[in-house]
Amino acid sequence: MCNNRYTLDGKIHDAQRLRELQKLPLDNKILIAQARLIEWYKYWNGQCYVGLSGGKDSSVCADIAAQVCELLGYKLVLWFADTGLEYPEVRRNVDDIYNYLKQKYNIEIELVKDYPKDRKGNRITFRQVLDKYGYPLISKDVSNTIAGARRSIAKGEDSYRLRKLKGTLKQKNGQPSKFTCAKWSFLLDAPFAISSNCCDIMKKRPAHKFEKERRLVSIVATMANESYLRLSTWFKFGCNAFNEASPQSRPMSFWTEDDVLEYIKLNDIPLASVYGEILKDEDGGYYTSGVGRTGCMFCLYGIQYEKEPNRFQQMKLTHPKLYDYCIRECDKGGLGIGRVLDFINIPYGKDDMKIERNNI
């Protein structure tokens, strides 16, 4: 088995190496991503699939995987999780990407469209997840910490998560832990449930079920700079995580959003219209005139870091009906996200919001 603690040139994965890789020109990054996918496909004898969301990152990953499949003579399997949380334009782009790849490459391509189901095979909706578990808020780590701390309080017990939230968590040497999140302790008093279960139920469980049924391993387009969890995973496994419980290839881990946009521009990859146009700023960097990132429309993770107009303010302009459903109270048939945003003091549709370059 490959030793994925090291890069192709024998260097260990650390912060310095990641910075070096991120500074490489796009052509070099494409070659490295191809090399990692060749390594992955060969190791698993072609029994792999690409997670395709219809967004810009996964579309690029699918195109590079198609190149590798054509080189090695393998079938390209694309898997789309139809969670009901995608922008309509992104959902439609899944078929556009499939048709684009069919025309461009001389390989067999299979597109599988799946959705989250309960044990009886009934579709699970986002509203059901919110009602049963709570809202995904701030980050997966913070949501998980809040949920665990609340359980500890209900039992009258101390716990790792409660100490983490109160800021009293210590390292082995007695020093304060860097993993505390006391900043968000006020969320313990929020008048709504908070949970990190959403992604697991809506995406990960269907993916694992598909992997088990088809005996395939996954390829995804996540990047190390997107979160601390993804960064630490790259430090541990590199791009190809052979030794994870669920093996996964992340061939674009060292890429940046600028790389993705440049690749799409150069290769004329189909792009969902919600992104708008790909443009260059004064420094030569790429950006989109529409939304910057798509993902799940109603997700609250990272909202605290967004400049105005944030994702919900943009949604009000671009998708007013979906915005109304999102913000409206639960007892009036909505998702109740408005009151959640009010609680953490995040604007979501005020008339005086600032209009910036990425506004549609």
Residue spans for each PLM region:
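ATP-dependent adenylation/nucleotidyltransferase module used to activate substrates
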Residues: C2-D259
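ATP/NTP-dependent adenylation/nucleotidyl-transfer catalytic domains that generate, transfer
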Residues: C2-R19, G46, E244-A245, T256-I360
